[in-house]
Regions:
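A conserved beta-strand/loop capping segment in the N-terminal third of enzymes
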Residues: 86-121
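Flavin (primarily FAD) cofactor-binding/catalytic cores of flavoenzymes
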Residues: 2-60, 108-235, 239-497, 517-520
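Tryptophan-centered motif/residue detector
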Residues: 64, 95-98, 127, 457
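Short, solvent-exposed beta-strand-terminating loops
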Residues: 77-81, 85-93, 268-271
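Long, low-complexity, intrinsically disordered segments
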Residues: 501-520
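Non-catalytic nucleic-acid substrate-recognition regions in nucleic-acid-modifying enzymes
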Residues: 60-61, 80
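Glycine-rich phosphate-binding loop and adjoining beta1-alpha1-beta2 segment
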Residues: 65-78
């Protein structure tokens, strides 16, 4: 008896490049970036005869957060939040179709968990990508221009060899441009300069100093360093800490090994899964948030990050249980510091003529030749201390930015006073409604921007704009609660002079900002 079935069902596998490139062809859509959001748009576009689309990415193939593909880790949304189901439950590109095609539908059913493994979600996306003919890999977009005569965008891309060298250039023309370029890792200011110094090789023999996005390639070196400090408070920080705490890659019982966790969050906040809170990932709340003044959106945005960047409650419990188990025979060499910010950092090489020692004072000849010295400030106490560590994992999140390749068309785009995209409710950033942004609109649309569960709905809105018709039903109301005031609440009145909503919101947001799931 076999445990897996051959891959026979599902949409046929697409060729890598189904047709010769025609630079004069004007498509309906040119997408830049092939992460889950643009991949979902490609899948929803595939069956549409009136949408001619192509999607470009510099990568050679689909890979979703490869640096955090930790064994056993799950995604934090149910399997229904796949690439297509929330827009088209009958799509052949659904997660359930993938499970059926790969012989894993019944095992998944018996497993009785709504949350797929992270590696499983990556395999699903790769399965979908292999079956779409609209994807062009190894294309690095270098410039976007506008051709008024053709009323189309001209997307210039370098073609890349497997080693990353440039082999040529291409032009792709499209009436609509969809930006799905994702976000980039962010380091706190106190660590940026030091990380750059290490990357430039200015500290020979220094231990790893990496963002969590690059955790797996450095995991063995981190575990071998002798002492590791994790900075951050969200799911990524928790997963790295748990992975290094004990087991194959880290062992808190090993002589000289030390693992610390530092966050400026007041506590290790779990992600909130209560149902009325989840209604904030709805079209109605997105409408409400988008209509608020910029200043209030700024405050609410900082406050609400903890709603989707917290830690899985199960993982919090698992970490505690591991610490409890490890502490049975002796204290665990670990320190968990909350409400504590890294305000400065430097590297100190080992003193000449003496062997380096680990954070716990044990000799460790195999470890790095020096230590990182972190200056930490405790917010409540107002005091600063220094802590030493041989390696650092910085799990402080990601941020969106405006790609440089848009410089030739910046005059066509809208920006707010902080230089960010001024994204309309329909996800466009130009007055002609031709340039669409996916996951670059958290400051205008709130917490639905990075949400995998809302991506299919957003893509249905994009396709409605592209085609001029509602290809997939776009729900307008799904929530039981009302955000703002009901329509029959009577005429609006100003708050009394003594009530300062902005001041109250600012105070609330200041406290909540430290609780943000990916806070430094």
């Amino acid at each position: 008896m076999t445990t897996t079935a051959p891959t026979t069902s599902g949409p046929a596998r697409a060729p890598h490049d189904p047709a010769p490139h025609d630079p004069a062809r004007v498509r309906d859509v040119v997408g830049v970036g092939i992460g889950p959001f643009n991949l979902g748009l490609a899948a929803l576009s595939a069956p549409l005869d009136d949408v001619d689309a192509v999607f470009l990415d510099a990568a050679s193939e689909f890979r979703w957060h490869p640096g955090m593909m930790i064994e056993g880790a799950t995604i934090q949304v149910p399997f229904l939040a796949d690439l297509v189901t929330m827009a088209d439950p009958t799509s052949p590109y659904s997660f359930l179709a993938f499970l059926k095609a790969t012989g894993r539908l019944y095992p998944f059913y018996i497993r009785e968990s709504f949350y797929p493994l992270r590696a499983e979600y990556d395999a699903y996306c790769r399965w979908v990508a292999a079956r779409l003919g609209s994807l062009r890999w190894s294309r690095r977009v270098i410039a976007v221009e506008h051709d008024p005569a053709a009323d189309a965008f001209v997307v210039r891309a370098e073609t890349l060899a497997p080693d990353g060298s440039v082999t040529g250039t291409e032009e792709h023309r499209g009436r609509h441009l969809v930006l799905g370029v994702g976000t980039s890792p962010v380091l706190p200011p106190a660590l940026r300069a030091l990380a750059d110094e290490v990357a430039r090789g200015e500290h020979p023999g220094a231990g790893p100093l990496v963002h969590s996005a690059q955790y797996l390639p450095h995991r063995d070196a981190l575990a071998a360093a002798g002492s590791v400090t994790v900075v951050g408070s969200g799911q990524s920080a928790a997963e790295v800490y748990r992975d290094l705490l004990d087991g194959v890659h880290g062992d808190a019982r090993r002589p000289g090994y030390r693992l610390d966790w530092v966050t400026r969050s007041p506590r290790f906040f779990p992600m909130e899964y209560t149902k009325l809170t989840l209604e904030m990932t709805s079209p109605e709340y997105t409408d409400h948030f988008h209509a608020l003044p910029l200043e209030l959106r700024q405050l609410l945005g900082r406050e609400q990050r903890g709603l989707y960047k917290g830690i899985s409650g199960d993982l919090v419990d698992e970490i505690y249980d591991a610490l409890y188990r490890l502490s049975l025979d002796r204290p665990v060499p670990t320190t968990l510091l909350t409400d504590t910010e890294v305000v400065a950092a430097r590297y100190e090489p080992a003193a000449r003529g003496r062997g380096d020692t680990g954070a716990a004072g044990e000799p460790d000849a195999a470890g790095p030749a020096g230590e990182y010295v972190l200056r930490l400030r405790h917010a409540q106490l107002g005091r600063e201390v220094e802590r030493r560590t041989r390696a650092l994992v910085v799990a402080t999140g990601y941020a969106a930015s405006v790609p440089a390749f848009l410089d030739p068309v910046r005059h066509l785009l809208r920006f707010d006073e902080l230089g960010r995209f001024d994204v309309a409710r329909d996800y466009t950033v130009d007055d002609a409604r031709r340039v669409h942004v996916l996951n670059g609109e958290e400051h205008t649309h709130g917490i639905t921007a990075p949400d995998l569960g809302f991506a299919a709905w957003r893509n249905a809105v994009v396709l409605r704009t592209v085609t001029g018709r509602e290809v997939y039903p776009v729900e307008e109301r799904i929530a039981f609660q009302t955000f703002g005031l009901p329509d029959d609440a009577g005429p609006a009145t100003a708050p009394p002079p003594t009530a300062s909503r902005t001041a109250d919101a600012a105070a609330s947001a200041a406290a909540a900002a430290r609780a943000a799931g990916e806070a430094r």
